[in-house]
């Protein structure tokens, strides 16, 4: 299999329209978002709305994921996700968030996160992360997954499989009364078995009526975190796991984060609810 050349920015298509009847988050058209100090524990009413947002986000991710194949552009994946969201009455949360120009993130190969969909053509052997967030009913639902394109090298296929497994192991630790830090401990201990490195500077987050409510969910072991999980908390778990070192660079677009050594990376994400007895995944179909 020929080696993939390092990625570079493609050409952006025009901004996709959203029907006027679909409610926008407050930050659309503004340089910043009003967020970061909202309650971490949600009301039953907000939780029920988040179930709706989560299902729509999951549906958009599944539809876009089906299209991942050699020869497809990342802009086409954005079109599919965008149309699914608006057809279901949801606003694409990333569109206009701090100036982000597209309706989802598409992060290939060495892109850790926040890749912008453009004219980049997916090549046989690529791995493609799609990150979709739906805003409907005044709340957000956020999810992502990494999809293989064509014949993926064993090293990269295993990275994807193990990142998915690390994510699910972490989700299964969620329980009221348990320290939030156990999430990162489980992810990092599993990833370290294979010599992988867990990204530190980009984290999971609290989510609800705002995209990021101030709660930070680390994906690495940090016992100093004293937060205890409580029923009604909603947050994402979304580990990014690298084959190589943790050093990264950000492209001139201000968003796209790539590994400095250009080794590949994978990610999965769900929005979660801490229940009275454990966890509910809100971003499931």
Swiss-Prot record:
SUPFAM superfamilies: Creatinase/aminopeptidase. It catalyses: Release of N-terminal amino acids, preferentially methionine, from peptides and arylamides. Optimum temperature is 37 degrees Celsius. It lost all its activities at 55 degrees Celsius. Keywords: Aminopeptidase, Hydrolase, Metal-binding, Protease. Substrate binds at residues 114, 212. A divalent metal cation 1 binds at residues 131, 142, 269. Its EC number is 3.4.11.18. Its cofactor is Co(2+); Zn(2+); Mn(2+); Fe(2+). InterPro entries: Creatinase/aminopeptidase-like, Pept_M24, Pept_M24_MAP, Pept_M24A_MAP1. One of its GO terms (cellular component) is cytosol. Inhibited by bengamide derivatives and by various metalloform-selective inhibitors. A divalent metal cation 2 binds at residues 142, 205, 238, 269. CDD domains: MetAP1. GO terms for molecular function: cobalt ion binding; initiator methionyl aminopeptidase activity; iron ion binding; metalloaminopeptidase activity. Binds 2 divalent metal cations per subunit. Has a high-affinity and a low affinity metal-binding site. The true nature of the physiological cofactor is under debate. The enzyme is active with cobalt, zinc, manganese or divalent iron ions. Most likely, methionine aminopeptidases function as mononuclear Fe(2+)-metalloproteases under physiological conditions, and the catalytically relevant metal-binding site has been assigned to the histidine-containing high-affinity site. Pfam families: Peptidase_M24. GO terms for biological process: protein processing. HAMAP family: MetAP_1. Belongs to the peptidase M24A family. Methionine aminopeptidase type 1 subfamily. Removes the N-terminal methionine from nascent proteins. The N-terminal methionine is often cleaved when the second residue in the primary sequence is small and uncharged (Met-Ala-, Cys, Gly, Pro, Ser, Thr, or Val). Requires deformylation of the N(alpha)-formylated initiator methionine before it can be hydrolyzed. Monomer. This is Methionine aminopeptidase 2.
